[in-house]
Amino acid sequence: MIKYGILFTKKKWGIYMLKSWTPGEMPDKEEMKMQLEKTKSRLYDLQMKIKEHKLPVLVLFEGWSAAGKGSMIGKVIKNIDPRFFKVATMSSPTEEELRRPFLYRYMKQIPEEGKFTFLDSGWMEQTVMDVLTGELEGELYEKRIESIRRFERQLTDNGYLVLKFFMQIDKGEQEKRMKKLLDKEDTKWRVTGADKWQHKHYKKCENVIDRYMKDTNMSTSPWDIIDAKDKKWAELQVMDTLVSSIEV
């Protein structure tokens, strides 16, 4: 396991949540390139172990707008046989889904034995949005959190590997990335009104996210905060965590 910054401390669950988190030291480019190739190769090899041991792996990617959640999933799945994974991007719930228990639509995405499911945002994003809009507070919030903790515990108790990544960038980096997208005709559509609102209210969103992460950080399904300012460094952190978690 690579002993750089966050990778070295990630198993100390319950300590490094968002507001108290600081990025680890990024390795030099040559070291990073070498380690990334090793972890990619190892992840490719571990597919058969996952299949043989019938290990279902659920990987949840959360993070700030423009932090690179979708592109990171794209990089990871390049190293996995398409037969062994699926990717789910969770849009706004339908009317039918709103009538069902909150976690219903996520339960439908859990992986089969020996396969991966990668979720591009999930129950964290929806919960944070519900808090920010005032729909979820007090006892309702506590019940939601307890249902999420119970859901994740049930998965891990039944042999699922649950990994939760939060792609972290600061407000300045987010502004820079959004401006780059908005400046080009073919990419400006990617910045939504919700993205702009989040950027304007970055601190408020950070407070809600930080509380949520503390409330749902468990030894069996801890949060891994990924320093996403540098894309290659972010990829190495994610790949190393995937490999080391499967090898345990």
Q: What does each model-found stretch correspond to?
A:
Residues A88-M90, E95-L140:
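Conserved nucleotide-sensing/catalytic segment adjacent to the nucleotide-binding pocket
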Residues C205-V248:
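NTP-dependent small-molecule kinase module
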Residues G14-Q35:
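Charged, amphipathic alpha-helical linker segments immediately N-terminal to NTP-binding catalytic cores
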